[in-house]
């Protein structure tokens, strides 16, 4: 993937850039692997906003991705196309299996049209192949890693990310996450070889608010810029600091929201960025 920069012909074009989509080989998706994706606008079943800054955007259809691949062990597949997926940052690859079935997978780096991929304990160590962690050499970069055997890939599914297999001891493998966290995972869990492609996606400059609206992202308005009826930080004469510790529109303290004491915390060897100096 490369990034194409625009000339500053308008204020919205100034500094903006776009992916060149050179790796895309087909523009129309496989119809049998599509599912409807109705818009929620960030609302729940009662019509209340539960996730802010969502709404609008271009109409999409969901591409059904195979995150397990366990039922295709030993069945080789040919990469028919590399396609664009509006629902994720990574590209997806359409596989044609030898038994005639078609499936989508997340496309790793260096996977090309015409390549052969396979899954199972005996698969080769090359991009796109899927194996249990116990069969992958130490030091290999992997993606689409399961947290529980048979549960489907949960880790490293975004563009440009990869996990390093640091070692194995007993029933667990030690992994280094993209965040720097080191955690243990059952060696029966499966993973795909290589890092995910489209790494330059994070370097795209969207240029104008309208492009974010096309993506279904609405503006983020500060609470101190609102009226008192809209936010606890709103109101006041002139510019104010809000007058209290940061809270959300419902008055609950803002900040870290992750629940402590999760059962899987015992498998974390080192928290993310534990060695980074603060200052």
Swiss-Prot record:
The keyword rRNA-binding applies. One of its GO terms (biological process) is cytoplasmic translation. It comes from the Bacteria. SUPFAM superfamilies: Nucleic acid-binding proteins (SSF50249), Translation proteins SH3-like domain (SSF50104). Residues 40-58, 269-279 have a biased composition (Basic residues). One of the primary rRNA binding proteins. Required for association of the 30S and 50S subunits to form the 70S ribosome, for tRNA binding and peptide bond formation. It has been suggested to have peptidyltransferase activity; this is somewhat controversial. Makes several contacts with the 16S rRNA in the 70S ribosome. Belongs to the universal ribosomal protein uL2 family. Part of the 50S ribosomal subunit. Forms a bridge to the 30S subunit in the 70S ribosome. This is Large ribosomal subunit protein uL2.
């Amino acid at each position: 993937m490369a990034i194409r920069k625009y000339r500053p012909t308008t204020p919205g074009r100034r500094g903006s850039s776009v992916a060149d989509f050179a790796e895309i080989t087909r523009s129309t998706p496989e119809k049998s692997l599509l599912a409807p994706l109705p818009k929620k606008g960030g609302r729940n079943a009662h019509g209340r906003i539960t996730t802010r800054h969502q709404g609008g955007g271009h109409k999409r259809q969901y591409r059904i991705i195979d995150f397990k691949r366990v039922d295709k062990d030993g069945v080789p597949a040919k990469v028919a196309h590399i396609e664009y997926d509006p629902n994720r940052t990574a590209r997806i690859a359409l596989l044609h299996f030898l038994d005639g079935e078609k499936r989508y997978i997340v496309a790793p780096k260096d996977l090309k049209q015409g390549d052969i991929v396979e899954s199972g304990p005996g698969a080769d160590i090359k991009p796109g192949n899927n194996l249990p962690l116990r069969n992958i050499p130490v030091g290999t970069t992997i993606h689409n890693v399961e947290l529980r055997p048979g549960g489907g890939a949960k880790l490293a599914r975004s563009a440009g990310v990869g996990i390093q297999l640091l070692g194995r001891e007993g029933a667990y493998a030690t992994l280094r996450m993209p965040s720097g966290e080191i955690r243990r995972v059952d060696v029966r869990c499966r993973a795909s070889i290589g890092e995910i492609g489209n790494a330059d996606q994070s370097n795209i400059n969207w240029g104008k608010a309208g492009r974010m609206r096309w993506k279904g992202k609405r503006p983020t308005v500060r609470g101190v810029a609102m009226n008192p009826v809209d936010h606890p930080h709103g109101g006041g004469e002139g510019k104010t600091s809000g007058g209290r510790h940061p809270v959300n529109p419902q008055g609950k303290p803002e900040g870290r929201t992750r629940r402590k004491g999760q059962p899987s915390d015992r498998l974390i060897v080192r928290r993310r960025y534990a060695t980074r100096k603060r200052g």
